[in-house]
Amino acid sequence: MASVHGTTYELLRRQGIDTVFGNPGSNELPFLKDFPEDFRYILALQEACVVGIADGYAQASRKPAFINLHSAAGTGNAMGALSNAWNSHSPLIVTAGQQTRAMIGVEALLTNVDAANLPRPLVKWSYEPASAAEVPHAMSRAIHMASMAPQGPVYLSVPYDDWDKDADPQSHHLFDRHVSSSVRLNDQDLDILVKALNSASNPAIVLGPDVDAANANADCVMLAERLKAPVWVAPSAPRCPFPTRHPCFRGLMPAGIAAISQLLEGHDVVLVIGAPVFRYHQYDPGQYLKPGTRLISVTCDPLEAARAPMGDAIVADIGAMASALANLVEESSRQLPTAAPEPAKVDQDAGRLHPETVFDTLNDMAPENAIYLNESTSTTAQMWQRLNMRNPGSYYFCAAGGLGFALPAAIGVQLAEPERQVIAVIGDGSANYSISALWTAAQYNIPTIFVIMNNGTYGALRWFAGVLEAENVPGLDVPGIDFRALAKGYGVQALKADNLEQLKGSLQEALSAKGPVLIEVSTVSPVK
């Protein structure tokens, strides 16, 4: 009779999963033993890095990623990264080894007490099988739960003595199961949307990350061009759903209630696609919408639809809805919006570069299809203004604001997109949350470029301290970190740029390299 171990690997294989992202402990060794030759194991040195790498891989590949963590402690280390995955609808299958069944009740060392509850509410589904024979069925359920819209992480705890037990003899029925979450568009909803857009005198469009996840970017461009409507990206955007040099593009929305209502004032119909309404950040009280503005959102997530504080919501397949709207709305006789002017160059300070210059240089030198990961949070506005992001899957950011995402996620994105150059732009404060992911990049020779914006301070916190009128706050500076030394210690080539000439030379060298490169750039803080 087939074992749980062999049956589970065959299930993963038949479902198109051949990569395990992990950091093993003793509870995980029975699962990893006799590791199949047609699988690959991507090791990271800490669990937040494991989940970050897998998250990047899942988002870029648009496929579920399989993760193996160490019991409760490893799961706990991964929770911050899991919050980003939950908010980005990343299809992650997170497994964790559990103590042997005979020892769970006495809570022996490495017991995951109440395992199914540990990762909630950051997972769609969480479970520990009641018996060893049930493990393949639970794994199949996890795969399909993670993959169905809205996608998201799931969690499965497996006692380590289960792997050598006999599987249910009917587990083979699970191997080739296909579960579809396709939903036919509601004609009534479509009719309401099309009529609202056709009759609008001044419509506006707001796009979110699920547009990019659904690869619906081109349809949204067509929709904007037919409506001659301005397009904003929803606040706190973790992906880029629209070309940033398109005439209709108006940039990244602010993250305050009053600021958004002021921005949308005068637009009689606002269509939001693939974004929560809205992911606010700083407290900026005011009207959600000005009088005369009607908002309709299209989302794949019922939770997002239910919690929106205003407007109507339609839960639907993002790709299908974007395509239908693009083909059904009437061509407007309005003039196409005038493209926003490209920002002017910035004068340089001696010994340090302005962030604007770094982004201008990246924009000039990087390949047109480059992929950017951003965790230089104090310079996000400058990045959106200056990078010409043309293609789907060109930008990723921590969806829950949890730092430590970009460095490992860039490695996962590069694994999923080997033909495109991945460039992670990371603040010196952010980089330290997951710096050990550099080791993984070096060991697997993953040719990601890491640009560390070193200004010696938590710039985003300094900005927020001003918003909150919080003076004399300690712990906002992070001096004395040698990122080149850290990179070299993990086996990554490291370069330095204190001026524009050095930056250009370092980028040229990094773009020609066959492995990972870190460039430490001395920058001026945008916040004093």
Curated annotation (Swiss-Prot):
Its cofactor is Ca(2+); thiamine diphosphate; Mg(2+). GO terms for biological process: mandelate catabolic process. Ca(2+) binds at residues 428, 455, 457. Disulfide bonds: none annotated. It catalyses: phenylglyoxylate + H(+) = benzaldehyde + CO2. Its EC number is 4.1.1.7. GO terms for molecular function: acetolactate synthase activity; benzoylformate decarboxylase activity; flavin adenine dinucleotide binding; magnesium ion binding; thiamine pyrophosphate binding. Mg(2+) binds at residues 117-118, 120. Homotetramer. This is Benzoylformate decarboxylase. It comes from Pseudomonas putida (Arthrobacter siderocapsulatus). The gene is mdlC.
